[in-house]
């Protein structure tokens, strides 16, 4: 006992210092070990999140590709068939051609000239209107289906708890979904008369200086078609052409839709407002211009290949070009699986990029 007391008195300071060091070291070890475990847990969580992100990206890519297939195999064929029938019904040139054929030797020169001039206007109106309608309707439907598909994917992810960013997204009612998709028929069922009238006015303005004996070459035909398109697109207020594709905008609705707290606004109206915002965007206007130009160039090139050697390339009188224009109608409005023009537009790099970015633009 005396030995212990003596040892303590003699080495107390050293013992306390040693104990303090050991205690501090143990505490530091525990802190380090705890910190290391937290870092390991965090790394596992981050790895899990990255894995989930990759899974979601893969699922989104697959869903995006399936949506494009739905457009090409289901939605677009129905719309194109409906459009083709309506254009044939509304712009019928057969009665003019019949009068020209039946009146040979019986019509006076002024009567014959008037009929040829009517045929000229109607032929160009029908060709350009068909070209414009097919292009715009195909792009519009693709916008619709991508917007709807994106919302449906988001709603599914929300229901499964796959994303913490989707808490405020409302589920789409089945009726709203069907109503939204069926609104693509607006062009054919509601807007066609005014579209024909305005397109015919544009054709008359561009063609008023062209005579039946004027020589039409490939380049002249391309320029003429694009001039009619440009006059039509630039007449009226900016983006007036959107009102041929969808019902006119309700400004009151647009304001209330921007307020996410207004539950009285249906999902259908939210989808329609979002669609209109896409259509009036600079990016969409750009792909419209690119698509219409591409369609026109390919169509005229195809017309050239179907003429006799040295036809449009060297030039033909306008009167002899009109029957060729009539032959293009079935080609322009052919079903999507056989429509070369739609396939070319769909595969344009600018169009592909636009719809990829549109689908990837997840609502916050």
Curated annotation (Swiss-Prot):
Signal peptide: none annotated. GO terms for cellular component: peroxisomal membrane. One of its GO terms (biological process) is peroxisome organization. It is found in: Peroxisome membrane. The chain crosses the membrane at residues 15-32. The keyword 4Fe-4S does not apply. It is a single-pass membrane protein. Residues 33-62 form a coiled coil. Keywords: Coiled coil, Membrane, Peroxisome, Peroxisome biogenesis, Protein transport, Transmembrane, Transmembrane helix, Transport. It holds the Pfam family Peroxin-3. Involved in morphology determination of peroxisomes, but not in import of peroxisomal matrix proteins. May act as a docking factor for PEX19 and be necessary for the import of peroxisomal membrane proteins in the peroxisomes. Belongs to the peroxin-3 family. This is Peroxisome biogenesis protein 3-2. It comes from Arabidopsis thaliana.
């Amino acid at each position: 006992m005396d030995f212990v007391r003596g040892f303590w008195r003699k080495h107390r300071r050293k013992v306390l210092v040693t104990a303090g060091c050991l205690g501090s070291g143990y505490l530091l070890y525990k802190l380090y070990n705890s910190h290391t475990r937290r870092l390991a847990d965090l790394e596992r969580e981050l790895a899990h999140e990255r894995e989930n992100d990759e899974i979601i990206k893969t699922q989104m890519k697959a869903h995006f590709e399936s949506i494009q297939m739905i457009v090409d195999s289901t939605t677009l064929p129905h719309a194109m068939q409906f459009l083709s029938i309506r254009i044939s019904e509304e712009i019928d040139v057969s009665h003019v051609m019949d009068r020209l054929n039946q009146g040979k030797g019986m019509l006076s020169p002024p009567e014959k000239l008037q009929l040829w001039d009517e045929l000229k206007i109607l032929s160009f109106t029908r060709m350009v209107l068909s070209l414009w309608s097919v292009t715009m309707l195909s792009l519009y439907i693709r916008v619709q289906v991508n917007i709807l598909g994106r919302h449906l994917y988001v709603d599914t992810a929300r229901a499964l708890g796959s994303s913490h960013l989707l808490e405020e997204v409302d589920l789409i009612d089945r009726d709203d979904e069907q109503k939204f998709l069926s609104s693509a028929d607006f062009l054919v069922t509601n807007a066609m008369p005014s579209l024909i009238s305005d397109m015919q006015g544009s054709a008359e303005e561009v063609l008023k200086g062209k005579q039946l004996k004027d020589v039409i070459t490939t380049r002249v035909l391309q320029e003429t078609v694009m001039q009619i398109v440009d006059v039509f697109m630039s007449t009226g207020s900016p983006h007036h052409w959107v009102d041929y594709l969808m019902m006119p905008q309700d400004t009151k609705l647009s304001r209330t839709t921007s307020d996410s707290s207004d539950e009285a606004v249906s999902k259908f109206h939210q989808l329609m407002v979002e669609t209109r915002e896409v259509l009036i965007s600079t990016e969409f206007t750009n792909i419209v211009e690119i698509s219409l130009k591409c369609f026109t160039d390919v169509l005229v090139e195809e017309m050239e290949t179907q003429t006799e050697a040295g036809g449009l390339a060297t030039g033909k009188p306008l009167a002899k070009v009109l029957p060729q224009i009539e032959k293009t109608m079935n080609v322009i409005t052919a079903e999507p699986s056989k429509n070369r023009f739609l396939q070319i537009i769909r595969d344009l790099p600018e169009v592909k990029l636009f719809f990829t970015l549109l689908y990837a633009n997840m609502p916050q």
